[in-house]
Amino acid sequence: ASDVYKRQMMYGVNDTDRLHFATAAGKIGNGLDEQLENFVREHPDTKLIIIDTMQKIREVGGEAYSYASDYEIIGRLKQFADKHCICVLTVHHTRKQPAGDSFEMISGTTGLLGCADGSLLMQKKKRTALEATIDVVGRD
């Protein structure tokens, strides 16, 4: 059985024709845009798309990550989400060092937060802990 199916079974998620998984995706600007458009055309009742992780859809190359490149990635996903009135949730990692503001722990530049409508940061006190807290911030 696939890893996705095993996880569904482990968490007690019933199989449904309204839940779809894709285990491969193009890069933003290089296939992903078309994949997303095709998906919502085939599934017009889509309300949520989760991308896990954002790093997998970034262009790989010599360009260093900058505020502009981070802002562009989120901006393109936001434009797609707004066009289709859906939520696109991207999973991204945090830095391991502590920060005064928990959102400063997000890996990358502030461009990731600057363009998104909102951000959620889930943290555990210990990696093996069963409980976590979620901090939420909105652009407005």
Question: Where on the chain are the PLM-derived regions?
Answer:
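Conserved inter-motif catalytic segment of the P-loop NTP-binding fold
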Residues: S2-A68, E72, Q79, R139
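Phosphate-binding/switch region of NTP-binding enzymes
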Residues: L48, Y67-D140
